[in-house]
Each structure stands twice: as C-alpha cells, then as structure tokens.
A protein has these predicted regions:
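N-terminal export/targeting leaders of redox proteins
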Residues: 1-22, 102
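Extracytoplasmic c-type cytochrome modules immediately beyond a signal peptide or single-pass transmembrane anchor
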Residues: 5, 11-12, 53, 59-61, ...
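Sequence/structural segment immediately N-terminal to covalent heme-attachment motifs in c-type
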Residues: 20-37
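Alpha-helix N-cap and coil->helix boundary residues
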Residues: 21, 41, 58-62, 75
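Axial heme c-ligation environment in periplasmic c-type cytochrome domains
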Residues: 33, 42-53, 66-95
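C-terminal alpha-helix
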Residues: 97-101
Length: 102
C-alpha cells in the first residue's frame, strides 16, 4: 500500500510538467484564444472535447486534421479556422493532451 502511494506521488509530479508544457504550447499556438480547459469560450472546452471523443477509434487522427485544416459544424455554427502555424507533431501532441483532459 505504501509503495502504491509513493508511486502515485512520483507519477503525479512527473506528469505535471508535461501538462504545463502542453498548456504553454496551446497558448503559444493561439489555441487558448478560442478554447479553455474547463469552460466553453468561442470553441468547446477541452474537457468537453475529451468526453465527446472518449474511446472513439480514430479520434486522435480526426482531431489532428481538424487542428491543422479547420472545420465546421461539429460544435455549432462558428467554424474552427485552419492553423498553418501548428506543425503536425505539435498538433498531435496537443490532441493527445486534450483527449487526456478530464
């Protein structure tokens, strides 16, 4: 039991910098101009995106394409613009972070 608690503590400390790094990347790529983690802004909250796509096969690839190319109609009438300033690697990293949001 004691080892489990220690392991959980160590893992949470190690995971925290990754979460902060992804939030910083989202800010740097202007994602946070339209999105937030917990609240709808112009676009949906990341936790809502994670809930909608939880367990869906191909969700990661679909969302990477949406980040890069934009799209409309999934979350209402306001379209998501294409993001040419985001590399595919950064888009994939952001999508993985978004899908892990609770």
């Amino acid at each position: 039991m004691k080892r489990s608690l220690i392991l959980c503590g160590v893992l949470s400390v190690l995971a925290s910098p990754v979460a902060f790094a992804q939030a910083d990347l989202a800010k740097a790529k202007n994602c946070m101009a339209c999105h937030a983690v917990s609240n709808k802004v112009v676009g949906p909250a990341y936790k809502d995106v994670a809930a909608k796509y939880a367990g869906q096969k191909g969700a990661e690839d679909k969302l990477v394409a949406k980040v890069l190319k934009g799209g409309a109609g999934t979350w209402g009438s306001v379209p998501m613009p294409a993001n040419p300033q985001v590399s595919e690697a950064d888009a994939r990293s952001l999508v993985k972070w978004i899908l892990a949001t609770k």
